[in-house]
Regions:
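Bacterial Sec-dependent N-terminal signal peptides
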Residues: 1-12
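Basic, polyanion-binding surface patches
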Residues: 10-183
Length: 183
């Protein structure tokens, strides 16, 4: 009798996630999704950082599924984004709003925010960090990164925004969606 060994489950499946295609099964409103706040994480197994984000976009660019995020120059996470090849964006259940609130008001410069919240860090096959408490994880490979250049602002909206914003001009990171999982 021939025995077939069970296939090795991915770390994400071990943590209750199922892989899905953002192009076929992303059910959230792309305009509202970032307004509801998501968690951005970058780094590696030695050191990572996450922050709450409310700006972003999801769609298609260069014939690839793409996700765009923005990080201000004085944010601790920006160095992790600049030094990383991949990043994750995570959704959390509404009842976990303390996670998004804390990650959005505390700096990783002052301590390990994930540890302070009791979050469990796991890693994708690419080594990208995510938290097992998330309800959805989208992993992206950075295709483009650049800071906004104020000389190209064409309306008063960004001019007025940055006139009172102490964290500096944002950098834009466009990532190709390479993996997505949800619970």
């Amino acid at each position: 009798m021939m025995m077939i060994a069970p296939s090795k489950m991915s770390a994400q499946e071990d943590n209750g996630f199922k892989k899905f295609s953002v192009e076929e099964a992303f059910e959230d409103n792309g305009f509202q999704w970032f307004r509801d706040a998501q968690l951005l994480c970058a780094g590696n197994k030695e050191k990572s950082n996450a922050m709450t984000i409310g700006w972003g976009g999801i769609g298609t660019l260069w014939q690839r599924p793409a996700l765009t995020v923005y990080v201000a120059e004085q944010r601790f996470t920006q160095k992790f984004m600049d030094d990383s090849e991949y990043f994750t964006v995570m959704s959390f259940d509404v009842k976990d709003s303390k996670v998004l609130n804390y990650m959005g008001t505390k700096s990783g410069r002052d301590g390990d925010k994930a540890q302070a919240l009791g979050l469990h860090t796991a890693y994708t096959a690419n080594g990208t960090p995510y938290y097992t408490e998330a309800t959805m994880v989208i992993e992206c490979k950075i295709m483009y990164a650049a800071p906004f250049d104020p000389q190209y602002f064409k309306s008063d909206v960004p001019k007025n925004m940055y006139g009172n914003f102490t964290a500096g001009v944002h950098s834009m990171y466009i990532g190709e969606v390479v993996n997505a999982w949800k619970k």
